[in-house]
Structure formats: structure tokens, C-alpha cells
Regions:
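Short, structured coil segments at secondary-structure junctions
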Residues: 7, 85-86, 201
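Short, charged, surface-exposed secondary-structure boundary motifs
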Residues: 23, 99-103, 174-175
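Metallo-beta-lactamase
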Residues: 35, 42-44, 135, 142-222, ...
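C-terminal regulatory/interaction regions
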Residues: 236-260
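Divalent metal-coordination and catalytic microenvironments
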Residues: 10, 29, 39, 49, ...
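Active-site HxH/HxHxD metal-binding segment of metal-dependent hydrolases
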Residues: 42-47, 54-135, 225, 229-232
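Conserved beta-strand hairpin/beta-sheet module of binuclear metal-dependent hydrolase folds
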Residues: 2-56, 60, 157-167
């Protein structure tokens, strides 16, 4: 058996537990013998994760749910294989359920033709649909579900006391999850989600990538301000709400203004 290395009471992060980074952060939350897993990552890590869970003495029969923060391939490619091994229900937002069930490679980023990316994506059924305000019971504790769209339309976060399992919303360096229209990114929604996190009294953010960190309101303010600017930049294509240069150009054309 392995010695458990919880980061906080009732919380183990499996990269940290293993002492090596093998993919996205995988959180095991447990109490009174019951447990859930948040995200899994790629198929190649599933056997290692399953062995680790077994050697940490978490009975598979006590798993309440395999939770997907959202339906991006780097979080869920291994979900079907994990479900087969653990035999627990999958929980995700309704907007993630369809791309998971249909193995939608475009929506999940499993296929990006221009970059030569085409990853296998086995379909997986979602038995538990969860949404904002729902509670997930684990022994005597509960995860509170937050819908925090922006990176994707199905992005969920999960609150446990003063901890927030924050998905791809924000990382320790102030970066955010990829902004891309075809898989459901929305800058206005992203800003609202970040404001919700900032306004909350959570103390720790446990993201899906990179280190866990204390909530930093100054850093969040800078990130929110940056995304507010993104809304008015051509760089972000159809995710932008407007492009002020086009308004200026229209006025200059109407006025017959020459280049200076």
C-alpha cells in the first residue's frame, strides 16, 4: 500500500501523489470510505492511475462518480477506459454529455486538422448530469457544483469549503484556458466566471493544469482586464464582440478622409 499524501484534508492530487507530472491534474476527494475522481487525462495514464488508486486503498466499489470538468480531450480521452476499470458512473454538465457520447473530435479538440492532430476518442455515456448549484455527496462532505463557462460552454468548477477545483478557468501565472470559438469559448461568459471566482470567499484554487495556488485578487483583476480588452480585438475572431478599428474605418470612408 502507498502512503497517502493529501494536499488538504480529504484531497489527493495524483500527479503530486506520484511525484511526477503525467498529465492534467487528477483530484481524488474522499470521506468516510467514499470517493470521487475529477478528470483523468489521456488514455496512456489510465493504468497508472488505476493502480495508484488501488494501492492507496480506495475500493473501486466506493467510487461515487468519475467527474469531467468539461469535455476537452486532454481531460477525458481516458474516461471510457477508466469507467471500464472502476465501474462507476460518469458525471458532467449536460453540454458535455453529447460530445462525450458522440465522441465529437472537433468539439473536444481531439482533432485539429491544421496542426496534424487526430487523437482516438472512445465514446462514453454520462449517467449523472450536473449543473450549477447541485451537490455531490462524498461520505459526510459535499462538493458544490459551479457552472463557470468561458473556456468551454460546459466548464464546471467544484467548491469544497474554502477550496475551488477551478478547471481551466485560471492558472497561477494569470493565464486562462484556451479561447477558441469552435469548442464553445465565450469571452463575456469567461469574464463573468472569473468575476464570480474573484468575488467568492474561496482561499485556494486547484486548477486542472499546473500548481495549486492561493486566490490572488490582484492577479484575477489583471486577467479580467486583459479578457475585457480581448473582446474588442480582431485577434480573437468570432469570440470578440466588436472591433473598434472597423468603426473608425467606416467613419473615415464616409468622411472621405485620406491616409496621413
Amino acid at each position: 500500500m502507498l502512503e497517502r499524501k493529501p494536499l488538504f484534508p480529504n484531497v489527493i492530487e495524483l500527479n503530486y501523489q506520484a511525484g511526477t507530472v503525467f498529465g492534467c491534474n487528477v483530484y481524488l476527494i474522499y470521506d468516510e470510505g467514499e470517493w470521487v475522481l475529477i478528470d483523468i487525462g489521456y488514455e496512456e495514464v489510465v493504468d497508472e492511475v488505476v493502480d495508484m488508486i488501488r494501492n492507496l486503498d480506495f475500493p473501486f466499489s466506493k467510487c461515487q462518480a468519475l467527474i469531467a470538468t468539461h469535455a476537452d480531450v486532454d481531460h477525458i480521452q481516458g474516461l471510457a477506459l477508466l469507467k471500464q476499470a472502476i465501474k462507476a458512473p460518469v458525471a458532467a454538465h449536460p453540454l458535455a454529455a453529447t460530445p462525450l457520447r458522440e465522441a465529437d473530435k472537433l468539439k473536444t479538440f481531439a482533432q485539429i486538422e491544421a496542426q496534424g492532430i487526430d487523437l482516438p476518442l472512445p465514446p462514453v455515456e454520462v449517467e449523472k448530469l450536473i449543473d450549477d448549484g447541485d451537490k455531490i455527496a462524498i461520505g459526510g462532505i459535499e462538493l458544490e457544483v459551479w457552472l463557470t463557462p468561458g473556456h468551454t460552454d460546459s466548464q464546471l468548477s467544484f467548491r469544497l469549503g474554502d477550496l475551488l477545483f477551478s478547471g481551466d478557468n485560471i492558472y497561477r501565472d494569470g493565464c486562462v484556458g484556451a479561447i477558441d470559438a469552435h469548442h464553445g469559448s465565450d469571452l463575456n461568459a469567461f469574464i463573468s466566471s472569473l468575476r464570480r471566482i474573484r468575488a467568492s470567499d474561496v482561499k485556494w484554487l486547484l486548477p486542472s493544469h499546473g500548481p495549486i495556488f492561493r486566490k490572488d485578487e490582484e492577479m484575477l483583476d489583471k486577467t479580467i482586464s486583459r479578457l475585457e480588452n480581448y473582446r474588442h480585438m480582431a485577434d480573437f475572431g468570432t469570440c470578440a464582440t466588436d472591433w473598434s478599428l472597423m468603426d473608425e474605418w467606416e467613419r473615415e470612408v464616409a468622411e472621405g478622409k485620406l491616409p496621413t
